[in-house]
Each structure stands twice: as structure tokens, then as C-alpha cells.
Amino acid sequence: MGAPLRTVVPWTILVGFLIAYALFSPRAQTIGLIGRLGPIMLFLATISIVINLAVVAGLFHRVAEFAATGRAASGPGLWVVVVLLAAVSTTFLSLDTTAVLVTPLVLALARRAGHDPIPLALTVVWIANTGSLILPVSNLTNLMAVETGLFDGTGHYIRLAALPATASLVVTLGFSWVVFRRRLQPSPQGQPGLRNTGPQKSAAHPLLHLSGCVVAVLLPLLTTSIPFWWSTSAAAIILVTAFALTDRSVLHPKLVPWTAMAVAVGLTVAVQVVHSLGLEGLVRTGFAQLETAEGLLFALAAAGAVLSNLINNIPAYLLLEPAADSSLALTALLIGSNFGPIVTPWASLATLLWADQLRRAGLGVPWRQFILLGIPLAVGTVGMSVTALAFVPGLDR
């Protein structure tokens, strides 16, 4: 099946599904679903355009080259560089961007330094998942949660998410360091089997500096109360206009992740249908029987983590969302559905994208390591983060 057909087929099925849903659902419910998904899909499309055009301009390769210089080019210094790249990318550009963008950069940096790339690659995918709570834009589930109306703006969301997000990152970094510290020294033989797909010395793209300025302005805007899709749309318009004037050949529909967007919309609508058939009431009733607020937080997080590893974190979050009747409870569910899916390969789209990048680089995916190390890490990050959430001061419970 060719690339265009792979895009057309899921969207054709989705459009038919949406038409059927609109015909057989109450009008208010359909309008509400469109109002919820519209800004999210626009954000996904525009942030993808910004990222992909910045990649064409060579921005992220230059950042990686600059970061991995001197003592930071190998040993523990390279681990720190990888952590910073993955954490910043996940926070501002989403976990999926980290999987697709940072993974090949890290593999190339590891090859250049003569490192075993697997410890660094595993650290990247862990941070992509366990570092994806701090901002609404860090994860698609966060965006869906913000659109429920339970959060009073971006500032309220960040105040709730900051402490558990920090706890998760601390646990992840500590775990990575303890497990891999002896494997972070470069090998004299290097990694000759790894294809060099990362940073290379080359002439600067004419739009490199403009891309850097656009991204530098965009990132802090994503932390403000300005609607996230306004900021990314403006950034996308600027870069598309600039490339249209200098290099139109890179402006094509593949800049937008159509298939991923179709899957996200389809899963959302499918879960909405399942809820309308009676599951929503069962979910609410089941969790309402918990006697304490703290018990509800831990139950939602645990259920989100387990269900994410059984199916996938997006439908897991959507299935359990009705049980979260406050911003605090919804944050607990996000902790489980964001940090928990690091055990099974299919639990997170970011993990699948990460594995694809490893295969493209000629590496086998270490699924056994991923699963065995993911179990204690998932338990640790989810447990510590929910504990931290329970101590967030001055917020509704």
C-alpha cells in the first residue's frame, strides 16, 4: 500500500464513521465533540508543520551539535545532554516529537562518541513518557483533559501538574543513572554498525536563524494563557510563508501527521460511542464507591496505568475520564495514562515511533529490557507522582 493510500484509507473510514455518529447522536453531543477535538487537531497539525520545517532548516541538528561539545560529547556528560534534549523536547513539543526527533539525534551522538546506544535510547523513551505531564501540549491526553473544562486555564493545570511531573522526572533520571551508569563509558571500538543519521557538519540553511527565532518565541508562549493553537498556528504561518518564498519543494501534505490524527479522532469517537451505550455510568459508579479522596487518586492512576498497557493510553484515558470529577482526580488519571505506559510496546504511540527510529538506524529493539525495566519504573513514577499530587497545597480536591 503506497503512502498516499495509507493516508486516504484511514481518513475515508473515519469520515464515514463520523457521518454515522453525527446522524445517530444528539446534536448537542456532536457539536460538543467537534468543539473539543477541533483545537486539539489544529494544534497537532500546526505544531507538526513547525517542527518538520525546523528540521528541514537544520535547527535541531545544530542544537544537538552545540549541546554535545567538549566534555559533554561522551561519558556522563553525554547522558546529561540526552536528558536535557529529551526533557525540553517532551515538555514543549510533545512526547511523540521526542520519539521521532530526539531518538535519531541521540543515536548519532552515541555513535560519534563510541557509546552503546541502547542505554541512551531507553532513557529517551522513558523521559518521553514520564516527562509528558508538565504542560498541556506535552501529551495529547493532557490536551483532552484541558478541554474538559475542569481546569481553570493553563496556569491552573501547570500548578497541579508541576509537583507530580517533577517527582516523575526525578524518579526516571535516578533510575536511568543507577541502571546504566556503568554502561555510559565509550567503547574504543565505537559503534560501527550504526548508520550515521544525525548531526552532520554542513552549510547553514538560509532559514535556519528564522526557524530558531520562531521556535524560541513559540516555546514560552505555550506556557501562557494564550490558546496553544493560536501560538502554533501563527508560528506555522510564518514558516510556511518563508519556505514558500525560498523553497516550495518542502511544502507538501506530509508535513501534517494525517494518519495519527485520524487514529486519535477515531479512538475518541469510538470511546464516546461506547460510553453512550452505558459504560460511562458503570465507570462513574465503580469509582464513586471509593471512600477517600486519596484512594480515588491512587485508584484512577493505577487503573490508567494498567489499562494503558493492556490497550493504549489514549483509549484508556478516555474510557476512565468520566470517573474524574475534579481537576485533581483528572490529574491523577493523567499520571497513570502518561507515566504508566512504559511496559508494553503498544501502550504508547511514542514508544512505537521510538522503536521505528531504532529499526531505521539498524538497531534491534530491546523489548525484553524495555519490559523488565519498565515495570519497576512505571510503579515508581506513578506511585511517587500520585503521592506528590496528594500534597499539592491550596487546590481543589
Residue ranges of each PLM-predicted region?
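Membrane-interface alpha-helices at helix entry/exit sites of multi-pass transporters
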Residues: 73-81, 112-124, 151-162, 327-338, ...
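Juxtamembrane and boundary regions of transmembrane helices in multi-pass small-molecule transporters
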Residues: 45, 155-202, 349-397
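Alpha-helical transmembrane segments
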Residues: 36-48, 156-174, 329-344
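Alpha-helical transmembrane segments and, especially, the helix-loop junctions at the ends
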Residues: 90-100, 117-151, 173, 308-318, ...
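Long, contiguous bundles of hydrophobic transmembrane helices that form the permeation core
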Residues: 169-247
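Interfacial loop-to-helix junctions that mark the boundaries of transmembrane helices
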Residues: 2-8, 29-40, 152-164, 202-204, ...
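Hydrophobic mid-bilayer segments of alpha-helices in multi-pass membrane transport proteins
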Residues: 2-25, 36-49, 207-217, 226-244, ...
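Membrane-embedded alpha-helical segments and adjacent helix-loop junctions characteristic
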Residues: 27, 31-117, 258-260, 264-326
